[in-house]
Amino acid sequence: MIVVTGGAGFIGANIIHALNLRGETDILVVDDLTDGTRFRNLAELDVTDYMDKGEFLERVKANDLPMGIRAVFHEGACSDTTEWDGKFMMENNYTYSKVLLHWCLDRKVPFLYASSAAVYGASDEFREERECERPLNVYGYSKWQFDQYVRKILPSARSQIVGFRYFNVYGPREQHKGKMASVAYHLHEQIKAGQNPKLFEGWDGYSDGGQQRDFVYVDDVCKVNLWFYDNPEQSGIFNLGTGRAQSFLDVAQAVIRYHGKGSVEFIPFPDELKGRYQSFTQADITALRDVGYTAEFADVASGVESYLAWLDR
């Protein structure tokens, strides 16, 4: 059995889909379906069982999980970068992760988990090194602190531990995220509603719509996850992006090209985001390449086209 926490969420559901494509259905989904609309991501997937996150955590602590767990993909977290309840964030993203990590280590079960590019925050360098890590919000801090915890354990670990610092992931099965869904999704919805796509005006030295991020298609994220699953001798913390920064304007142009209509409107940059916003990210994927991952990553033009076609299927 494979455990996927956050399995009803964006990346978790896509990992399950990728496993299903391999014929793997012996999967335990762990999530919180208090928001019942999130069932939609699971309805098209094949899994063995579902367990509420609270029950799962209690059973982890009580050593009462099913036998034969072969790997844990730990995608469950609060990923809202605007959430400032630090106690809530640390319980969900740090303490929960530590408990599950030690359960896996005690049983030599591979543990593959979601970190985040938010650990870099205000940095203008994006290497998996301490001097590059300057989180701007408590979400980024919660992910960074768990990475720090993992770093201390890695040298003595006797089973696989892999952390993925996800950059700006977009693609199928993110619709439930609301305001935290990708810019590609929101621009697509705006054009469908008869509006022009809207981007922020320039800020922090960038032109209108010129802020740049490393936008990575979720299919590529799943491929990297499964490559490490297939190579359990590889451990570490790795950036998971394309290694290529592209502007929000590039995303808007890809959406406009798909629809064949629309022109970008620029809106004022929100005061509440000033000083808390990453205007530029670009993954340094040297470490990922050094361990043997060779596949290429989709650029914005091809990734957005595939994504919008999926949304309109």
From Swiss-Prot:
Q: What is this protein called?
A: ADP-L-glycero-D-manno-heptose-6-epimerase
Q: Which UniProt keywords apply?
A: Carbohydrate metabolism, Isomerase, NADP
Q: Which reaction does it catalyse?
A: ADP-D-glycero-beta-D-manno-heptose = ADP-L-glycero-beta-D-manno-heptose
Q: What is the UniProt remark on how the cofactor binds and its stoichiometry?
A: Binds 1 NADP(+) per subunit.
Name the cofactor(s) required for activity, per the record. NADP(+)
Source organism lineage? Bacteria, Pseudomonadati, Pseudomonadota, Gammaproteobacteria, Pseudomonadales
* Name of the gene: hldD
- Signal peptide start-end: none
UniProt GO BP: ADP-L-glycero-beta-D-manno-heptose biosynthetic process; carbohydrate metabolic process
What domain notes does the record hold?
Contains a large N-terminal NADP-binding domain, and a smaller C-terminal substrate-binding domain.
So what EC number does this one have?
A: 5.1.3.20
GO molecular function per UniProt: ADP-glyceromanno-heptose 6-epimerase activity; NADP binding
Active-site feature positions: 139 (proton acceptor), 177 (proton acceptor)
PANTHER family, sorted: ADP-L-GLYCERO-D-MANNO-HEPTOSE-6-EPIMERASE, NUCLEOSIDE-DIPHOSPHATE-SUGAR EPIMERASE
Q: Which residues take part in binding substrate?
A: 168, 179, 186, 200-203, 213, 277
